[in-house]
A protein has these predicted regions:
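Glycine-rich phosphate-binding segment of PLP-dependent enzymes
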Residues: 30-37
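C-terminal hydrophobic structural anchor segments
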Residues: 268-317
Length: 345
């Protein structure tokens, strides 16, 4: 019989939280000093309207409890916002100076002018600078509860927490969450390669995908399937998370940079319409098959045979591997191996 209590205790041991009561002034100071980071993935999605921002400010003035801010502690001791970016950004847009606002790319936005307040009607049409110093100080000294996930917590727990807390707020894609959780050299490497011109010509994405981390995820898929295919079971998300958490160790950046750029230079030369199969956007499973298959062939032979590629991309056997239950391990292996053999000639 499964010991439910043991399972509960095992999972709880992976999570370590600390709780703080911080004033608005302290939070703004921490943002200004770089101790609190709001990831670019969050910054681009700050979209509360003026009325909603004003309502939060009114609640803070009146001492009405607002939801806690959730942060994750990084290895260097800084905090990363997990949940509460809209609330923190509102405080910054209302009471932050130019230096603080610049930290969240809000310097070009006009300071918040309160609107639609019902309890504090005389505060409407006022900015922070328009308020008496005593009123400003009361706002700055308002306390906010902050809960931080310590850096001792398991990386998978951090990813899970980001995912859970963002389901009702800012909708980040799995790769945007990875970019927040697995910060470091490998994450920076993915972002750099995602800008490669040949790669961009080969892979066609929708407008929304161009801005949600999909390009970085495709670079991650390329290396994950190239080097860690044996670890893949069925969940692509878990597979990519696991690879990203360990890829930084012993990864040869210079060799893999050269490999990636070489493969996509060759593919771009022979696929003027990209990896598309006649579609506007590139199917992810076809991308995996063609790019990883080409890389394996190049690693084995120092070249990629592209003769007849237009014909064999229409082959019924390949079609079988990229339709239906495409994330089953046999089909992933099947489509990559099919392309590898074709590229080897």
């Amino acid at each position: 019989m499964i010991d439910l209590n043991s399972e509960l205790m095992e999972q709880k041991m992976k999570v370590d939280f600390n709780t703080y009561d911080l004033s608005v002034k302290e939070l703004l100071s921490m943002v200004n000093d770089g101790l609190i980071n709001i990831a670019p993935e969050y910054q681009r999605q700050f979209r509360w309207d003026v009325e909603r921002q004003s309502s939060l400010v009114e609640s803070l003035f009146l001492g009405i409890p607002v939801p806690s801010l959730f942060m994750a502690t990084n290895v260097d001791g800084t905090w990363e916002v997990i949940d509460g970016v809209q609330r923190l950004s509102t405080m910054i847009c209302f009471a932050g100076d130019d230096n603080v606002r610049e930290k969240v790319n809000a310097k070009k936005v006009e300071p918040l002018k309160l609107k639609g307040l019902s309890k504090l009607a005389n505060f409407n049409d006022k900015r922070f600078a328009d308020l008496p110093v005593g009123v400003q100080n009361k706002f700055k000294l308002t306390s906010i509860k902050v809960i931080t996930l310590s850096d001792k917590s398991d990386k998978d727990v951090r990813f899970d927490l980001f995912e859970r807390l963002n389901k009702g707020g800012v909708n980040l894609t799995p790769q945007e969450i990875r970019s927040c959780v697995y910060r470091g050299g490998f994450n920076d490497f993915l972002k750099e390669l995602s800008k490669d011109s040949n790669f961009k010509n080969c892979v066609h994405l929708s407008e929304s995908q161009e801005n949600d981390g999909t390009r970085e995820e495709l670079v991650l898929r390329f290396f994950a399937y190239l080097y860690d295919l044996d670890s893949f079971e069925h969940s692509v998300k878990d597979f990519l998370n696991n690879y990203m958490s360990k890829a930084d160790k012993g990864f040869n950046y210079s060799e893999n940079d050269k490999l990636f750029r070489t493969v996509f230079k060759i593919l771009n030369d022979v696929l003027p319409n990209g990896i598309s199969k006649g579609r506007k956007n590139t199917p992810l499973n076809l991308f995996e098959a063609v790019s990883v298959g080409a890389a394996l062939a190049y690693m084995d032979n120092g070249k990629i045979n592209t003769v007849g590629i237009d014909e064999w991309l229409k082959d019924k056997e390949l079609l079988k591997y990229i339709t239906g239950a495409t994330n089953s391990k046999p089909r992933v292996i099947g489509r990559i191996e099919f392309c590898r053999k074709k590229f080897e000639g």
